[in-house]
């Protein structure tokens, strides 16, 4: 089971989240049939979204939109405070050649664009924030958003590693944030530690990457584990929800689906599940609209 661990330094000057999202990203790859580069781009977005949702309280939901002018198209993800996330990439078929070390590049091919977050607190007034894509690597873009939009200096590292068959091998990352009251000396100390950290891909390749991430962040410094939360890819779509959407169509359109198409098929963008509406199903909807 995927998980997110929340920690805080003994001094209370910093907090860090570390995540294992391997099964989440693996399931997303299976559902959307993504090729290598699309898998990594979507996976990083899902991880970033889970970090943002973990920062919220109550029954909030956070939507992340990575909108660039690249061949990836838009990447959309939605996560809640219960550890659930869903998402899709507009073009699942991007397969850019790897580097000599086997890395899948994303940033250089993301293009110009924006990192958009929409936080829904359930009050009917969602809060939207938009920051520019800085590198297109998603992790750096999330760090920039947290620092500039939420005014919380942050460091973020996240990645998805693939095996020789381009299947998800491991996925995860970390977020480190400065908390109010941190001294300049403490900030400088952790800035130096982050600069000296091994590459996120190296840490994820460790036998136990959760422990490797925590060791890289804290070293010998004492810290406290605050919480451990389970994470998963979970879509809340249903035939009933799509039936409600069909009810918003003009009756003539529903009649055409019934008489000309002998039914309708709706595919959920977020998880790829297909829902079939037979002629009888459409007849019920038409009668309900009457």
Swiss-Prot record:
<keyword id="KW-0346">Stress response</keyword>
<comment type="function">
    <text>Redox regulated molecular chaperone. Protects both thermally unfolding and oxidatively damaged proteins from irreversible aggregation. Plays an important role in the bacterial defense system toward oxidative stress.</text>
</comment>
<dbReference type="GO" id="GO:0044183">
    <property type="term" value="F:protein folding chaperone"/>
</dbReference>
<keyword id="KW-0676">Redox-active center</keyword>
<dbReference type="GO" id="GO:0042026">
    <property type="term" value="P:protein refolding"/>
</dbReference>
<protein>
    <recommendedName>
        <fullName>33 kDa chaperonin</fullName>
    </recommendedName>
</protein>
<dbReference type="GO" id="GO:0051082">
    <property type="term" value="F:unfolded protein binding"/>
</dbReference>
<feature type="disulfide bond" description="Redox-active">
    <location>
        <begin position="235"/>
        <end position="237"/>
    </location>
</feature>
<feature type="disulfide bond" description="Redox-active">
    <location>
        <begin position="268"/>
        <end position="271"/>
    </location>
</feature>
<keyword id="KW-1015">Disulfide bond</keyword>
<dbReference type="InterPro" id="IPR016153">
    <property type="entry name" value="Heat_shock_Hsp33_N"/>
</dbReference>
<dbReference type="Pfam" id="PF01430">
    <property type="entry name" value="HSP33"/>
</dbReference>
<dbReference type="InterPro" id="IPR000397">
    <property type="entry name" value="Heat_shock_Hsp33"/>
</dbReference>
<keyword id="KW-0143">Chaperone</keyword>
<comment type="similarity">
    <text>Belongs to the HSP33 family.</text>
</comment>
<dbReference type="InterPro" id="IPR016154">
    <property type="entry name" value="Heat_shock_Hsp33_C"/>
</dbReference>
<keyword id="KW-0862">Zinc</keyword>
<keyword id="KW-0963">Cytoplasm</keyword>
<dbReference type="GO" id="GO:0005737">
    <property type="term" value="C:cytoplasm"/>
</dbReference>
């Amino acid at each position: 089971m995927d998980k997110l661990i929340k920690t805080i330094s003994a001094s209370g000057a910093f907090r860090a989240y570390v995540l294992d999202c391997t099964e989440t990203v693996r399931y997303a790859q299976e559902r959307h049939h993504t090729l290598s580069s699309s898998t990594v781009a979507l996976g990083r977005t899902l991880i970033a979204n889970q970090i943002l949702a973990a920062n919220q309280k109550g029954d909030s939901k956070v939507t992340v939109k990575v909108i660039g002018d690249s061949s990836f198209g838009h990447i959309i993800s939605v996560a809640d405070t219960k550890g659930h996330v869903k998402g899709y990439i507009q073009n699942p078929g991007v397969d850019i050649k790897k580097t000599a070390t086997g890395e899948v590049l994303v940033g250089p091919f993301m293009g110009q664009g924006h990192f958009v977050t929409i936080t829904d607190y359930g009050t009917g007034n969602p809060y939207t924030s938009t920051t520019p894509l800085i590198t297109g690597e998603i992790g750096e873009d999330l760090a920039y958003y947290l620092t500039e939009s939420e005014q919380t200096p942050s460091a973020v590292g996240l990645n998805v590693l693939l095996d020789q068959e381009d299947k998800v091998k491991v996925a995860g990352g970390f977020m480190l944030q400065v908390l109010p009251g941190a001294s300049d000396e403490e900030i400088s100390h952790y800035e130096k530690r982050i600069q000296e950290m091994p590459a996120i891909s190296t840490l994820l390749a460790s036998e136990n990457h959760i422990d490797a991430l925590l060791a890289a962040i804290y070293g010998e410094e004492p810290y406290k584990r605050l919480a451990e939360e389970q994470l998963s890819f979970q879509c809340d779509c249903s035939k009933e929800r799509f039936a409600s959407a069909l009810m918003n169509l003009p009756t003539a359109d529903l009649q055409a689906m019934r008489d000309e198409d002998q039914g309708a098929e709706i595919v959920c963008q977020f998880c790829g599940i297909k829902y079939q509406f037979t002629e009888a199903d459409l007849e019920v909807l038409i009668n309900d609209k009457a």
